[in-house]
Amino acid sequence: MYYIQYIVARFFIFILLLFPERLRFKFGDFLGTVAYKLIKSRRLTALINLKMAFPEKSEEEIEKIAKKSFKIMIKAFLCSLWFEKYLNKPKNIKIINQENIENAYKKGRGVMAATMHMGNMEASTVSAGEHKIITVAKKQRNPYINDYITKLRGKANYMEVIEKNEKTSRVLISKLKEKKIYALFSDHRDKGAIVNFFGKETKAPSGAISMALKFDMPFLLVYNTFNDDNTITVYVTDEIELKRTDNFKEDVQNNVQYLINIMEDVIRKYPEQWMWFHDRWNNFREYKKNLKNKERRKWKNL
């Protein structure tokens, strides 16, 4: 069954790549609109999250952001299918403050780059230039598709992908001597520190902060925006000075919150670029379980 799924996926990719890039992105816009309308659970998740994050915005504004977010995320996924060619076209990429990556790398201790689920997501890795990258990703259920995606990532980004499991931390630490650039998503819910994010308590991954603190790695935030003309603008922050005391556990907690605050500011600036349909705060789960019927009715037509 997995192999049949893989063959169907490869056939779809083959057909898609026959079309010019401009039409592929138009197809991505179309798929994003369809997904927004048909996948009700994801649509509700995005709308509830946005209503929580931006209570001052009107329903119309919230829906506009949600629809744009769906389109951007679908286009980002499709673009990964021809990432190598896309990233090799200079007109597609603009990098702001790439020298910050270079200056951090020259320190000879590797670099920790926190990344976000926004824009053309993994395209941010182009800011590493010719330096090798290491990252972590969940293994896909379909082993054939998993291998195919891993190969695409490696070809396009000089990227080594570590499977996310109970051994991930040890594997990442064992790679430190290679002085690579670590690119770790740090904005979605995961085991780690309890933080305040858009005014609500939630969990945030602490792996990037923990490693940077423990091994004195230069730390930056790298993210990108997917522009209307289907180019991307990559932003590299100045090196983030992590706060250090004699209490490592508190340092991790405080610095994860500090990073979350920075990311929240970025999301507020570019709200349509972020992945809102992920149940980041368990809002959708709470909606299904706990809201009263009269409150449910308020959302039923969304």
Which positions does each model-derived feature cover?
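Non-catalytic C-terminal accessory region of glycerolipid acyltransferases
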Residues: K64-K67, K106, E130, I134, ...
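Membrane-anchoring hydrophobic helices of lipid-metabolizing enzymes
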Residues: M1-T115, N146-Y148
